[in-house]
């Protein structure tokens, strides 16, 4: 399917092009093009508009995107923005998802109490599924799939997604402070006359939380080289993905590989990581697709 390629340097371009994809992509149109029929979506079917109808019926808040669809729509967006820089552009993809819902189902955007909902984008059907031991530093921040066996799951906890902080010096409220997998306070007070950088109080009424679960995943037994011990990795599940995995399950996980400093203050309630190994870093896989 023809599409204007996105300039991957700009997040707004990613938002605009991804929104166009959600609004217009039709697998029936793509199949007609592949068959040489030349018909331009004669039925008017649009995959993600139809999916939104199901989300509305089920009160869902996650849009599942077939990566093959995105490649057909715009290869530059798929490979250079989403696949190569998923962690960087994820907020812009979610912004497009919110606008998509607002355009087609405005009643879904807010909870009954009037607070705005958070919407998520999850990708499935990537071209390659890695073995766990194939994940390296070069994969950090990319959209990647790997297969493994679940060995342990944690309880579900609330995670602080966007924090609102009140300055302890002048009482100024700083909203929507993005949390980077650890407890993150504002860099500086918004009050130009204050300059506070250190003293903050969390304003819970203005915060946004999401369900969070830690899952331990080990290499599949068939993939462990002879004479080697199986490797494992922590996977973070969020929102509708929590409680979907059980010990013993074999699954494909799609998301982004992150490096989290050991001993960094966590933004997961009740979660504490002891400093060890001289402050070494650990790999963590943030799930954003298949499960």
Language-model segments: which ranges?
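Long, low-complexity, serine/threonine- and charged-residue-rich intrinsically disordered N-terminal tails
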Residues: 1-250, 254-274, 278, 285
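Charged, amphipathic alpha-helical linker segments immediately N-terminal to NTP-binding catalytic cores
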Residues: 290-291
